[in-house]
Amino acid sequence: MRLKHFAASALLLSALTSPLVAYAADASDLGQSLTPLGGEKAGNGKSGWQAIPAWTGGLTAAQAPRNYRPPQHHPDPFASERPLLQVNAANMAQYSSYLTTGVQDLLKTYPQSFYLNVYPAHRTLAVPERVAENTKRCASTAHLKGWAMDGCVGGTPFPIPHGSAKDKALQILWNHITRFRGVYVIRRASEAAVQRNGSYSLATNDQEIYFKYYDPKVKTLAELNNVLFYFMSVQLAPPRLAGGAVLVRETLDQRAEPREAWGYNAGQRRVRQAPNLSYDTPIADADGLRTADDTDMFNGAPDRYDWTLIGKKEMIVPYNDYQLSSPAIKYRDLLTRDVLNPRPQRWEMHRVWVIEGTLRPGKRHIYSKRRFYVDEDSWQIVAADQYDSRGALWRVSLAFPKEYWEVPMMWSTLDAYFDLQAHRYHVMGLTNEEPTEFDATKPTPGDEYFSPQALRRRGIR
């Protein structure tokens, strides 16, 4: 099995050594030959399932279904489309150059349960004009500061990756970490760890996120005060944990100032600072299937790995997954045995940056190597391959993005984490059985709202 993993990795590596783009672009190309965030505006000139269309502005409220009112569940703007292709274990060999290593292993491991329905591609990414303007400015001012990013606020810092392969990889990773996901969003969502026999239990939370980095009132890094975002979550289920709460102060430069986290215990009615919520710390609600830095495909300081850019490639990845959050689909139908139900999943051909991190000598992490596939338009990591200490592929992570046109922003509607060795998986971001999805319509609170004192008040409600 290890030899198969290494062989597949070698084949993918060889296929990616020739990037599909030149790196001679500059900031003046943003909004011209490049999209406002740095993707190639042109399509690939191919047809059928291989076609990548030109970017023409994305999916905004003006083009969205007219019957939508935020924060309702989004109707699928592509509901009338049918798959152009189905990739499964029997035919995957002829499409392997378009598949991530992890997806290939999922197909091999679950030949009766997993397949990809490949639809026409739509480049739906749209962002507010101010984010586009800030990104153009950041293209000339942002720079790496060791493992950190400096010189940018309110935009994508490195829309045109440049420099060495290591520099480009770190810049792409920072684009993912700082990508636009609104300013203040709230939602009620569930997560579940699905066991080998298909059983699961839901953990449900009320969540609030304030992306201070994108607050239009914050104009300078000094005003930002090294805060990327605040995250507050109050547990609703299961009953034994109800009333507990978590607050995270996510810093931009975590080597200079590590993230801070606090937990409120409803039974003890006490707020305590968490000693460690980073790197490979296991997440309790994930039943050991997700580390702290697995969340959002990757988060936190990138300093435990040596990063390199492998290249840019056209690949079949999850995209425009409106069906996965449809209220017509119940959790019991979505959370199927072995893998997340593939029927409502939508896969499309898109260009992705492929970067790889190898654990640095003397550093500790349960993953010896990580490979990320980053959407060129949104800078969202859409797939991740995680390797164990022996060098064998261990876990496969998939993000299922869609455009939230009312903001507008692109974010994953849910994330799934598959353990190929334990034959279990974890899903977070479930909203199908909730009355609403993300609500980005509420006024933005200030820093004082996200304090340990406020955490206790939220937890006891």
Protein language model regions, located:
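Bacterial N-terminal signal peptides
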Residues: 9-19
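Solvent-exposed N-terminal domain segments of exported/luminal and surface proteins
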Residues: 27, 31-258, 265
